[in-house]
């Protein structure tokens, strides 16, 4: 059974929203001339707005022609800079069109960090290069660790970047070769040799890897090859463009039962695909919430739209090196915390075991089971099942064992049976 926030909290929330709306209206009146100007101007053609002037301390330039030619345009409210203080994550919706195609399609633009995080990045670069918090980034970048691979360095190696981000917490050479070979911010992609990249491209690659590796996840495990991630389109300065998938998973929380069953089955299939695949890369989702998934409006397909916190472990290397307890199945510990979207895990263990149940645990605990809480609700995506399913009890038992197993290795078996049962339910309701 799912529950809403208590009435007092609900009223307080509504009061705060009304107060914020009132303040916003006052600000809009006071700034009406600049408001009109920002509405009429396409700021996505402005080099400084794109922060193209900060390259190579940026994420790439492959889409600059499209931005600067006016092919990318903010949607309605995205044009109002006055609203940026509400957009903490720096995520925008826009329309993109190719002149030859006619018509436009929706895209998502990301700065890959908040204003504060981006300012801290600049300060960090400057302090490392000059000892001062402000500097010319163009001059500073070649004096940082992001330039260490410039020149005649042949490969991107684990020793150079290990631990820089979740993606490379425990990188194998095979993974890093894949990142370089599929790097989309160069005209000469397709080779794993660093010498085929320009110095500026190498610095952009390393900066992206350290600051927010999401673009590299999308490029290395592309949707075109069946991976469940949004499609990467390109970057200009510090603005990255990805394909718009659809409404976030949260908007389906109260969808009809048959729809929620199908979405739940897809989520478990994603957990399986990222854990066990022919490439022998395990992609572990370290941040799992309703906001990090979206659903296609036409095909109803579930896609991961926030891939910043993905740890990739090379199972082939684990089996080859055989670290201590490498072949002992690892069971993630249930985390009954009082916050939303909690997960308990050890990155070191994820990197050192060949058989891990983390993705099943993350999906069951944070999305599907009665333990899932989000935006004041509880009960998970599969709340309030039909009476015959609730009476049978099998679904609830499988969800509980998947989230908080009572038997040793119980989650592995529960996840397998849950996938099969959801597939059966999904077929029955279609």
Curated annotation (Swiss-Prot):
Function: May play a role in cardiomyocyte proliferation through paracrine signaling and activation of the PPI3K-AKT-CDK7 signaling cascade.
Protein name, as recorded: Divergent protein kinase domain 2A
GO CC annotations on file: COPI vesicle coat; extracellular space; Golgi membrane
Keyword Translocase attributed: no
Family (UniProt): Belongs to the DIPK family.
UniProtKB keywords: Autism, Autism spectrum disorder, Cytoplasmic vesicle, Golgi apparatus, Secreted, Signal
Location within or outside the cell: Cytoplasmic vesicle, COPI-coated vesicle; Golgi apparatus; Secreted
Signal peptide region: 1-35
Primary location group: cytoplasm
PANTHER family: DIVERGENT PROTEIN KINASE DOMAIN 2A, GH11358P
Gene coding for it: DIPK2A
Disease the record associates with this protein: Genetic variations in C3orf58 may be associated with susceptibility to autism.
BP GO annotations: cardiac muscle cell proliferation; negative regulation of smooth muscle cell apoptotic process; positive regulation of protein kinase C activity; regulation of phosphatidylinositol 3-kinase/protein kinase B signal transduction
Pfam families, per the entry: PIP49_C
Organism placement in taxonomy: Eukaryota, Metazoa, Chordata, Craniata, Vertebrata
């Amino acid at each position: 059974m799912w529950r809403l926030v208590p009435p007092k909290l609900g009223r307080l929330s509504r009061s705060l929203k009304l107060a914020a709306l009132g303040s916003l209206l006052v600000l809009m009146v006071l700034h009406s001339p600049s408001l009109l100007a920002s509405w009429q101007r396409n700021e996505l053609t402005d080099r400084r707005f794109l922060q193209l002037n900060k390259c190579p301390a940026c994420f790439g330039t492959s889409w600059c022609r499209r931005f600067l030619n006016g092919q990318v345009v903010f949607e309605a409210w995205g044009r109002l800079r006055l609203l940026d203080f509400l957009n903490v994550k720096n995520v925008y919706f826009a329309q993109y069109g190719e002149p030859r195609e006619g018509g436009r399609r929706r895209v998502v633009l990301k700065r890959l960090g908040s204003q504060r995080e981006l300012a801290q990045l600049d300060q960090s670069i400057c302090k490392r290069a000059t000892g001062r918090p402000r500097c010319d980034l163009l001059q500073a970048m070649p004096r940082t660790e992001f330039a260490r691979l410039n020149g005649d360095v042949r490969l991107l190696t684990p020793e150079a970047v290990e631990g820089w981000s979740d993606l490379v917490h425990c990188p194998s050479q095979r993974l890093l070769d894949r990142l370089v070979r599929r790097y989309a911010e160069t005209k000469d992609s397709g080779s794993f040799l660093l010498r085929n990249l320009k110095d500026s491209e190498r610095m952009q690659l390393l900066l992206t890897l350290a600051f927010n590796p999401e673009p590299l996840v999308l490029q290395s495990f592309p949707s075109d090859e069946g991976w469940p991630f949004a499609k990467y389109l390109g970057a200009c300065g510090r603005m990255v463009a990805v394909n718009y998938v659809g409404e976030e998973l949260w908007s389906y929380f109260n969808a009809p039962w048959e729809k929620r069953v199908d979405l739940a089955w897809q989520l478990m299939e994603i957990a399986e695909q990222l854990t066990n695949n022919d490439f022998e890369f395990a992609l572990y989702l370290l941040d799992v919430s309703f906001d990090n998934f979206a659903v296609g409006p036409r095909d109803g397909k579930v896609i991961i739209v926030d891939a910043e916190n993905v740890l990739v472990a090379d199972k082939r290397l684990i089996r080859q090196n055989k670290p201590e307890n490498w072949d002992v199945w690892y069971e993630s510990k249930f985390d009954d915390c009082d916050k939303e979207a909690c997960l308990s895990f050890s990155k070191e263990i994820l990197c050192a075991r060949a058989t891990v149940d983390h993705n099943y645990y993350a999906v069951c605990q944070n999305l599907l089971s009665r333990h899932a809480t989000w935006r004041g609700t509880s009960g998970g995506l599969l709340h309030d099942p039909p009476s015959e399913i609730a009476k049978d009890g099998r679904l609830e038992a499988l969800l509980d064992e998947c989230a908080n197993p009572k038997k040793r290795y119980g989650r592995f078996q529960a996840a397998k049976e849950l996938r099969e049962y959801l597939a059966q339910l999904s077929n029955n309701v279609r």
